A protein has these predicted regions:
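Amphipathic alpha-helical interface segments used for oligomerization, scaffolding
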Residues: 7-10, 211-217, 235, 256
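Repeat-solenoid scaffold signature
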Residues: 213-242, 444
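Charged, alpha-helical scaffolding/interaction elements associated with membrane systems
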Residues: 79-80, 214, 423
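Residues at or immediately flanking beta-strands
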Residues: 107-109, 219, 249, 260, ...
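Small/polar-residue-enriched beta-strand and adjacent coil segments characteristic
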Residues: 22-25, 59, 65-68, 72-75, ...
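Amphipathic alpha-helical coiled-coil segments
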Residues: 85-100, 169, 173-210, 227-232, ...
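Terminal intrinsically disordered/low-complexity segments used for targeting and assembly
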Residues: 2-78, 132, 156, 240-288, ...
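Surface-exposed, polar/charged faces of alpha-helical domains
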Residues: 78-81, 384
Length: 478
């Protein structure tokens, strides 16, 4: 039997394997938490009138209707250092995909050699025999068991997971920029309110001094009024420091040096308000939108594909090879006898020791189970975070409404106290108490507004919007 016949018979035996690909085909497991209909329902904590069931817009920060904020987010998404690092990670993952694809392509090798035989003694070098060889070798992996295809599938899924991680950075950056800008505006509003209360207290202090000078007041009253002024004034440096910290954070997020912080933001008089009910969507939309969920799902797909990569190790690896070359002395290099060529399959098979391959398959299956557990955990965390953020936002809005009413009542009481004191109906301690209550109400309301901004940012961060504001991968869970 000729070598050609043996090779042909071997190919005929192994060609049916081309219809099979090792390992399981990936699909979202039926027992995954994300596949449960209960995970797709409307949010339990999203029934307040301040929320709507509309799909959140991707550029959710535009709901505030502030062009300056929109410009800051755009700049940050273009220049943020964390995003630049995430983009580099994505390029590296894409290069890995190209590497895996190249493994299934034709490989070419060229070799050349020359020899010079030299006999010992007094033999002249010019008389030494010389020979040369030049060869071209081509090889193409047939990938009958599908190991290379599964490797490409795993590399693609890993690259998509890295893209999702990049998208998560975009979400975090957009939320951080919005939070920092709104904090600057909130601090400015609090500063204005504090200075307004301080102006009232200083006017009271001056009036008290005049009364004491005219014999209608005491030094004790002057001291108490001065203490109230100093107590309110002491809060201003802290507010200024907090505002500056937010401005510097904003600069860093935008990729600027501290000296180049956006000074125009210092003039924001108060935080912009949402112009409509906050759209939150439902659970199904959330899981489709959140990049961390997508990254976990793509990691599960990659782990599933790796089972096929390891399963392919149970089967022979067939490479179709072809070689052509020329060899001989310089005088005979162009003769017919110096040429040679061959073509045929090359078989590589780790057999009979299959226990190692089966152990690797078992390990790959365990990795897939780990990836599924991680995916389920991230889905549960996404739903929990969103429900928690919705509840916290609802309660903080209610708290702010109550504190706003309390501030109005305190301002009215402070004005009435001054009038009553002027007519001798109450003593000076009551005036100071009313003004202290107003200062406390202003402080509590400012704190609540800052908390409400933080709660809204946590909610938007939980909803996962903002990653599609630039080029990105498809966000759908497979």
């Amino acid at each position: 039997m000729s070598v050609r016949t043996v090779r042909g018979g071997l190919l005929a035996l192994l060609l049916p394997m081309t219809a099979c690909v090792s390992g399981p085909d990936y699909h979202l497991p039926a027992n995954a938490v994300a596949a449960s209909p209960r995970a797709a329902r409307a949010f339990v904590s999203g029934q307040d009138a301040s929320f709507s069931h509309d799909v959140p817009p991707d550029r959710w920060w535009q709901l505030y209707g502030d062009p300056q904020l929109d410009a800051y987010v755009r700049e940050a998404l273009a220049a943020n250092t964390d995003l630049r690092a995430a983009d580099a990670n994505l390029r590296r993952a894409s290069a890995t995909v190209l590497e895996y694809r190249a493994r299934g392509a034709v490989q070419a090798d060229v070799d050349a050699s020359g020899t010079l035989a030299h006999a010992g003694g007094y033999t002249q070098a010019s008389a030494a025999p010389q020979s040369y060889a030049l060869g071209l070798h081509l090889s193409y992996p047939l990938d009958l068991a599908g190991g290379i295809r599964r490797g490409i599938e795993a590399a693609n899924a890993n690259a998509e997971a890295v893209a999702a991680a990049r998208d998560q950075v975009r979400v975090v950056v957009a939320a951080a920029v919005t939070r920092a800008y709104l904090q600057v505006c909130t601090r400015n509003h609090t500063l204005a309110a504090t200075r307004q209360v301080l102006a009232i207290q200083r006017a009271t202090l001056e009036a008290t001094r005049r009364l004491a000078a005219g014999g209608r007041g005491t030094d004790f009253d002057v001291s108490r009024a001065g203490a109230a002024v100093n107590r309110s004034a002491a809060g201003i440096p802290h507010l200024l420091a907090e505002r500056q910290a937010s401005l510097l954070e904003l600069a860093a997020l935008m990729g600027r040096l501290p000296a180049d912080y956006p000074r125009e933001a210092e003039g924001c008089p108060q935080p912009p308000e949402l112009e409509q009910a906050l759209p939150v969507g439902d659970g199904w939309q959330l899981l489709q939108r959140r990049p961390d969920v997508r990254a976990a799902e793509r990691s599960l797909a990659a782990a599933t594909a790796m089972i096929g990569v390891e399963t392919a190790g149970l089967y022979p690896q067939i490479t179709l090879g072809a070689s052509s070359g020329v060899a001989g002395t310089p005088a005979h290099l162009l003769s017919a006898d110096s040429f040679g060529a061959s073509i045929g399959p090359v078989l590589s098979w780790h057999w009979p020791n299959r226990r190692a391959a089966k152990a690797r398959i078992a390990a790959a299956g365990a990795n897939a189970d780990t990836a599924l557990a991680s995916f389920d955990g991230i889905v549960l965390r996404a739903l929990r975070q969103t429900e928690t953020a919705l509840s916290a936002c609802t309660q903080e809005l209610e708290r702010e409404r109550s504190l706003a009413q309390a501030r109005m009542d305190a301002a009215r009481a402070a004005g009435q106290a001054q009038q009553l004191y002027r007519f001798g109906r109450i003593d000076f301690l009551d005036v100071l108490s009313a003004q202290a209550a107003l200062a406390d109400a202003e402080s509590a309301l400012a704190t609540s507004r800052a908390e409400r901004v933080d709660r809204q940012m946590e909610l938007f961060l939980s909803l996962g919007g903002g990653w599609a504001a630039g080029d990105t991968a498809d966000g759908a869970i497979r």
